[in-house]
Regions:
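Short, contiguous pre-domain boundary segments
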Residues: 1-3, 70
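Active-site rim elements
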Residues: 4-10, 80-81
Length: 165
């Protein structure tokens, strides 16, 4: 891995953690993917699909581009392998945005609302952490040890840290 700006690692972790969780869950049986837990978004599959679809939307706000067709929505069920591919593509494109865009640039969103590139990036990371935590809660509440998707797990998996949980 080449030298990176600090925000690059935050965004790379975001993508890595989502893809790692999707790949882990792709090996689970369909019944497990329909499990949920109190206080979470919904089913395990639905939570992961919502997470990836939202990241598509954040990228579309930032660039006008839609990666992965069609846009992943709550109403259609998408295979976890497709979600992982879309998450990877979206994450790579977000890194390009960070390298070239102005974080103070204002973006028209919807219903006349505006935000900056920086705030949209902050929301992308927050939203990802929130729903990955919900997905790992669903797994744990149903007796399944989730994969380690923390920052420490990212560091170990990429060989840039030896820190433990």
């Amino acid at each position: 891995m080449s030298a990176a700006q600090p925000l690059d690692h935050v965004l790379r972790h975001n993508t890595w953690a989502t893809v790692t969780l999707l790949e882990f869950c792709a090996a689970l049986d369909p019944v497990t993917l329909e499990m949920s837990a109190v206080g979470t978004y919904g089913t395990l599959h639905g939570t992961l699909q919502h997470l990836v679809g939202a990241e598509q939307w954040y990228l579309q706000l930032l660039t006008g581009d839609l990666l992965g067709r069609p846009r992943i929505r709550r109403t259609d069920s998408h295979p976890l392998t497709e979600l992982a591919m879309t998450a990877s593509l979206t994450g790579a494109r977000v890194l390009e945005v960070v390298a070239t865009d102005d974080v103070t640039r204002r973006i028209e969103m919807n219903e006349g609302r505006r935000s900056t590139v920086g705030v949209i990036l902050a929301q992308l990371v927050h939203h990802g952490n929130e729903h990955r935590a919900q997905a790992t809660t669903i797994l744990g509440a149903n007796g399944i040890e989730p994969p380690p998707v923390s920052g420490w797990g990212y560091g170990r998996a990429t060989g840039i840290s030896e820190a433990e949980e």
